[in-house]
């Protein structure tokens, strides 16, 4: 358990389909599809993936100008792409923002997640398609996050990190009671996504204020990801230099 991390370092469709990353069999057809899929990142995508953020849950009315206004607060932007439908031209609700400097990227990653833009609370993460080994997109049954209503939640990302597996010690005097409690906890863990706030607060706060009171999910792990990000970036730069 010492090597356990709430954020996946490598994408595994089977683990992503499990709230604690311990499933041994796929629980839905989408996971099967992702396990069988072979995905190659789009080589036509330009820009440095290690300086690019993924911004999602945008209002369909939010324009490029608004995103540039908000995200330029953290540093100079090199490239901004709001993804649109090729036929209708309407926004698909997500964008990619490339910064000129790593410092700006990290600041935006820490501070922009959860901001409200045009009445929508946005989600911010690093680009994963070109940086997370083994990545499988949502359309092939993979991805991360998702809505509970869809029945296809994917764990191991910033939005829905893995929950630490439950390993409760067995009490010799009360073996049956302990076993029932463990089963109850495991059953509950399948039905809800983990929230770091104390449970009693959930009853005291309205859903409309969730974005204001939300605690950062595993903030200490964000710092770990930043260190890993810098190490990976250095390795990538070295490979590029050697290939020249």
Swiss-Prot record:
Q: Where is the composition biased (Basic and acidic residues)?
A: 146-162, 173-185, 192-244
Q: Which UniProt keywords apply?
A: Isopeptide bond, mRNA processing, mRNA splicing, Nucleus, RNA-binding, Spliceosome, Ubl conjugation
Residues joined by cross-link Glycyl lysine isopeptide (Lys-Gly) (interchain with G-Cter in SUMO2):
172
For this chain's UniProt record, which GO biological process terms are given?
A: mRNA splicing, via spliceosome
Please provide, alphabetically and separated by semicolons, the GO molecular function terms listed in this UniProt record: mRNA binding; snRNA binding
**Listed SUPFAM superfamilies:** RNA-binding domain, RBD
- Keyword Ubl conjugation attached: yes
Q: What is its main location?
A: nucleus
Q: Which CDD domains does this UniProt record tie to the protein?
A: RRM_snRNP35 (cd12237)
The RRM domain extends over 51-129
Q: Which Pfam families match?
A: RRM_1 (PF00076)
The lineage's top-level taxon is Eukaryota
GO CC terms: nucleus; U12-type spliceosomal complex
The listed locations are: Nucleus
Q: Where is this region: Disordered?
A: 146-244
Against PANTHER family, the record matches this protein to:
U1 SMALL NUCLEAR RIBONUCLEOPROTEIN 70 KD (PTHR13952), U11_U12 SMALL NUCLEAR RIBONUCLEOPROTEIN 35 KDA PROTEIN (PTHR13952:SF6)
Assembly state and interactors?
Answer: Component of the U11/U12 snRNPs that are part of the U12-type spliceosome.
Q: What is this protein called?
A: U11/U12 small nuclear ribonucleoprotein 35 kDa protein
Species source reads: Rattus norvegicus
């Amino acid at each position: 358990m010492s090597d356990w991390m709430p954020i996946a370092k490598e994408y595994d469709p089977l683990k992503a389909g499990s709230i604690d990353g311990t499933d041994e069999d796929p629980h839905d057809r989408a996971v099967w599809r992702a396990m069988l899929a072979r995905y190659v990142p789009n080589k036509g995508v330009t820009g440095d993936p290690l300086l690019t953020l993924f911004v999602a849950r945008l209002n369909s009315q939010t324009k490029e100008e608004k995103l540039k206004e908000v995200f330029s607060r953290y540093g100079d932007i090199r490239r901004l792409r709001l993804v649109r439908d090729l036929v209708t031209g309407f926004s698909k609700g997500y964008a990619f923002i490339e910064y000129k400097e790593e410092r700006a990227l990290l600041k935006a990653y820490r501070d922009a997640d959860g901001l409200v833009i045009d009445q929508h609370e946005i989600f911010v993460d690093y680009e994963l398609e070109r940086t997370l080994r083994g990545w499988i997109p949502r359309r092939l049954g993979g991805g991360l996050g998702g809505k509970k209503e869809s029945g296809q939640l994917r764990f191991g990302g910033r939005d829905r990190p893995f929950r630490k597996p439950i390993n409760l010690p067995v009490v010799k005097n009360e073996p049956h009671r302990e076993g029932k409690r463990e089963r109850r906890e495991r059953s509950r863990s399948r039905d809800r996504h983990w929230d770091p706030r104390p449970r009693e607060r959930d009853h005291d706060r309205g859903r409309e204020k969730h974005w204001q009171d939300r605690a950062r999910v595993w903030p200490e792990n964000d710092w770990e990801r930043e260190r890993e990000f810098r190490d990976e970036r250095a390795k990538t730069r070295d490979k590029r230099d050697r290939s020249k």
